[in-house]
Regions:
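N-terminal intrinsically disordered, cationic/polar leader segments
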Residues: 1-286
Length: 286
């Protein structure tokens, strides 16, 4: 079962005087690319949280935020009066006739005007936070699975379209080879008397073998089936699907170069169109 790398997970933890909010977002990336924004009080646990996220999600561009909302009726912050007075005095020196009320409004917004005590986080609280992180990760993984199921249906549809086009190639191939043989025989009809018959047949067979696409058709059919079977594997493997898609592309390109038949080349163009859509979506598979 495939998974998308796109996902979102969220969880919340209500404690005595605060609420912890955890959010994780994921987009596609070749490797794990983890960005974190963590409230200062929990910075010492950042490495442990990063490891848990990386081990769980494996790949993707991940944005992880842990924020704290104060739910207490009293504020834990206090005004740093000496610093605020210092700011106001500097403003008065610059503008002696300025209003003190406006100076105060500006001063309380300046750096270090508010003091918030550093909160100690005990191990029991972190265990609860880690539990909520696990829940958020599960929500994100469920999102990835849901997106993966949608992508899988799209892959199956497009692989099926290529398989149907390959059936049309099979139907046209006999006609194509007969037409090529006829054109060649007609082209040399005037000089046939001067050409050894056996030699002519040998050259004709050699040329037709160069245009033969039997092996390409067989390999393409095998690659298409392999892609479908890989979709059903227990573990999502976007890299493997990408490699198979490359092999499918090689066989389709060879069909196009050997075709020498207008209708068959049109079919090859349709195959390439379906494959490009597959390749775009494979980039988002875990």
């Amino acid at each position: 079962m495939i998974q998308s790398m796109t996902g979102f997970g969220k969880s919340q933890l209500q404690l005595a005087h605060k609420k912890i909010i955890i959010e994780i977002k994921s987009l596609n990336s070749k490797a794990i690319d983890l960005n974190t924004r963590i409230a200062q009080a929990y910075k010492e646990k950042e490495l442990a949280m990063r490891k848990l996220i990386s081990d769980t999600l494996e790949r993707g561009k991940i944005d992880f935020t842990l924020t704290v909302e104060n739910t207490s009726e009293t504020s834990t912050s206090s005004l740093n009066e000496s610093i605020i007075r210092g700011y106001i005095e500097q403003m008065r020196a610059i503008s002696p006739n300025g209003p003190d009320v406006e100076f105060l409004k500006m001063a309380v917004r300046m750096p270090d005007a508010l003091t918030t005590p550093v909160e100690e986080v005990d191990e029991a609280e972190y265990v609860q936070i880690e539990g909520q992180l696990v829940i958020a990760l599960k929500h994100l993984q469920a999102f990835r699975c849901s997106e993966g199921a949608i992508l899988q249906k799209d892959f199956e549809l497009r692989i099926g379209n290529i398989q149907q086009l390959l059936v049309q190639v099979e139907t046209l191939d006999t006609e194509r080879l007969a037409a090529i043989r006829s054109r060649m025989e007609h082209a040399v009809e005037e000089i046939r008397a001067r050409v050894d018959e056996n030699r002519f047949e040998q050259e004709l067979i050699f040329y037709l073998e160069k245009l033969d696409i039997t092996e390409e058709k067989v390999r393409l059919a095998n690659h298409l089936n392999y892609f479908l079977s890989t979709l059903e594997e227990p573990q999502s493997n976007g890299r493997k699907l990408g490699f198979i898609a490359q092999e499918i592309g090689r066989e389709i390109n060879t069909l196009g170069s050997k075709a020498n038949h207008a209708q068959m080349q049109q079919i090859v163009v349709l195959m390439k169109n379906e494959l490009e859509k597959i390749k775009e979506q494979v980039l988002n598979i875990l």
